[in-house]
């Protein structure tokens, strides 16, 4: 996969870039693995807005992804397709198991149509195979990592990401996450070998407001442009800075730690995420 840029014939094309999607083999998803995906528009079940600046966007259908892969131990599966999923940044692959069942998984980088993947403790530590952390050699790059055994993959699922297995001691394994955080995970948890696909995703520049609307994101109003009743940074005569940057709820925006001091999972964190790898906001 590579990034394509447009000629700056108009301003909206000047910074515009898009991936060429050469790795996608079909545009027809497996119908048996599709579900309706209603658009909430940022509202909860009472109709009240709980997330601002959401709504619109292209209609989607949810692809059911197998994040557990535990009930197919020892059954080989063949990769039939590599597909685009509008609900996530990574590609997905359709697996056809030897028993006739079909399932989607997140595609690892380097996996191709026709390859065979396996699940379970007896599987080899090869790209696309899902194994317990006890069966994976130290130093291996993994993705789709469970945090609780049998709960399914919860970490390292975005495009172009991987965690590295650095140590094992007792009932826990040590993982270095993409954020820079070093964390303990139960050794019985499973992970998939390799790096997630679509590694160039971070280099895509939306380039224009319309592409953001296609994704279901509405324009975001600055706090300093609001009235003081609507935002702590609002009000003032003329152009004002708004004072110390903070959210609508008054939480400081620069360097203020929002994680609970006595959170139960603190004991599993060996080293907090590094400042250089913390996000700086969306595009």
Curated annotation (Swiss-Prot):
Region feature Disordered, mapped onto this chain: 1-59, 222-283
Record's GO cellular component terms: large ribosomal subunit
GO MF terms held by the record: rRNA binding; structural constituent of ribosome; transferase activity
Gene Ontology biological-process annotations: cytoplasmic translation
Keyword RNA-binding: yes
Top-level taxon of the source organism: Bacteria
Entry keywords, A to Z: Ribonucleoprotein, Ribosomal protein, RNA-binding, rRNA-binding
Annotated InterPro entries: NA-bd_OB-fold, Rib_uL2_dom2, Ribosomal_uL2, Ribosomal_uL2_bac/org-type, Ribosomal_uL2_C, Ribosomal_uL2_CS, Ribosomal_uL2_dom3, Ribosomal_uL2_RNA-bd_dom
Family the entry assigns: Belongs to the universal ribosomal protein uL2 family.
Biological function: One of the primary rRNA binding proteins. Required for association of the 30S and 50S subunits to form the 70S ribosome, for tRNA binding and peptide bond formation. It has been suggested to have peptidyltransferase activity; this is somewhat controversial. Makes several contacts with the 16S rRNA in the 70S ribosome.
Quaternary state and interactors: Part of the 50S ribosomal subunit. Forms a bridge to the 30S subunit in the 70S ribosome.
Listed name of the protein: Large ribosomal subunit protein uL2
Origin organism lineage: Bacteria, Pseudomonadati, Rhodothermota, Rhodothermia, Rhodothermales
Gene: rplB
